Amino acid sequence: MASLGRQVPEWHRLMALSWACLARQTCHFRKEKKMSPSLFCKLTTVPSRGNFQEFSSVRPKKYMQEPEHRTRLVPCLHEEQRTCMGSESLELERAISSLQDMGFAEAHIDSLLNIQPSVHPQQLLDIISELLLLGLNPEPVFMALKKNPQLLKLSATQMKRRSSYLRKLGLGEGKLKRVLSVCPKVFTMRQQDIDNIVKVLKEKCLFTVQHITDILHRCPAVLQEDPSELEYKFQYAYFRMGLTHLDIVRTDFLQYSIAKVKQRHIYLERLGRYQTPDKKGQTQIPNPSLKNILRVSEAEFLARTACSSAEEFEVFKKLLDQEEEESESHMSEEEEEEEEEEEEELP
C-alpha cells in the first residue's frame, strides 16, 4: 500500500507533463500553419484507474486550416491574366496609332492586323517600315502584304538583307512598286532563284546591266519563270522574229507567254503579214509593230492586225498544237535512237 501510495502522485505528475507537452505542440502547429510528422505520434498516458489510453495529437480535418498559398492562388492567376491582357491591348493600340501615322486608312489597318493574327504587332510595324523606306506608298504596301502574307513572317534582318540585294539590282527608289504588284513573292522567294534568272539574262541572253534592271522593273513576272523557258523565249524573239535586245526591253516582250507569242507570230507569218528580217534587219513587207501583235486583245488583233476571223484563228491554234506534239514526239524518238547508238558503240 505504501508503494501504491507513492505511485499515485507520480501518475498524476506524468499526466500533467503529457498534457503540457500536447498543449505546446498544438500551439506550435497553429503558429507554423503546417503539419509536422511528429504530430502524428500518439501519446500514451496513464489515467487514475490504471488503464492505458491513447490520445491522438491530430485534430479533426474540419478544424484544419487551408495553407495560405492555396487561398491566394486563384486571385494571383486572375491578376496575371489581367496584366497580360492589358499589355496586349496597349501594344495593339500603339500599333494602330503608328499605322495611322504612316498614312494607312482605317479599313486597311483592320485588314493588316488580321492578315496574320499570330504575328506580333511590333513585327508588323517593322516589316511595313522597311517597305515604306523602299519608296512605297501605303496602298501598294497593303496590296503586297495581302497578296503575300508570308512577308509578315520575315524578320527585320531578312527584310533589310533582301532590300539591300534588290537595290543592287537597281530596284530601289520607287521601282519596287510595280515589282511588288506583279510579283509580291520577290521578298520571300529564294535568292538563288533570283540569281538564276539574272544569270540567264546576263550570260545566256547577253543583256546589259541596265537592260536587266529595266526588264526586272517592267516585266517582274520573269522572276517566277523557269530559267530554261526564259532563255527559249529570248531565242525565239531574237532568231525567229528578228528582234533586237532593245526591242525586247522596250516592248516588254518577256512578260508574254511563249504560247501567245508563237500563236500570233506564226499565224501572221502564214498569212504573209510578217517576215523575219534578214541579216541587215530588212524585210520585203513592213511588219506590224509588237504593240499591235501582243499588247492588244485577241479580237483587236484579228480585226486590225491579222484581218481574219475568230473561227479561222481557232482552227489554226488546234493545228499548231498538233504540229508541236508531233514535233516533240519525233524529237524524243531521235534522242532515243542516239542513246541506243551510243550504248552499242561502248565496249
UniProtKB/Swiss-Prot annotation:
Acidic residues: compositionally biased ranges: 322-347
GO MF assignments: double-stranded DNA binding; rRNA binding
Ranges where the record places region Dimerization with NSUN4: 310-327
MTERF repeat placement: 142-172, 177-204, 209-239, 245-270, 290-318
Domain of life: Eukaryota
Disordered, as annotated region: 321-347
InterPro entries hit by this protein: MTERF, MTERF_sf
Principal subcellular localisation of the protein: mitochondrion
Signal peptide: none
Gene3D superfamilies per the UniProt record, alphabetical: Transcription termination factor 3, mitochondrial
One Gene Ontology CC term in the entry: mitochondrion
Biological processes, Gene Ontology terms: camera-type eye development; heart development; mitochondrial ribosome assembly; mitochondrial transcription; protein targeting to mitochondrion; regulation of DNA-templated transcription; ribosome assembly; rRNA processing
Subcellular location: Mitochondrion
Targeting signal (transit peptide) range: 1-42
Keyword entries, A-Z: Mitochondrion, Repeat, RNA-binding, rRNA processing, Transit peptide
SMART domains hit by this protein: Mterf
Subunit note: Heterodimer with NSUN4; this interaction may be required for NSUN4 recruitment to the mitochondrial large ribosomal subunit.
Record remark on domains: The MTERF repeats form a half-donut shaped, right-handed superhelix, where the concave side displays a positively charged path for nucleic acid interaction.
Function: Regulator of mitochondrial ribosome biogenesis and translation. Binds to mitochondrial ribosomal RNAs 16S, 12S and 7S and targets NSUN4 RNA methyltransferase to the mitochondrial large ribosomal subunit.
Classification via PANTHER family: CGI-12 PROTEIN-RELATED, TRANSCRIPTION TERMINATION FACTOR 4, MITOCHONDRIAL
Record protein name field: Transcription termination factor 4, mitochondrial
Lineage of origin: Eukaryota, Metazoa, Chordata, Craniata, Vertebrata
Gene name of the encoded protein: Mterf4
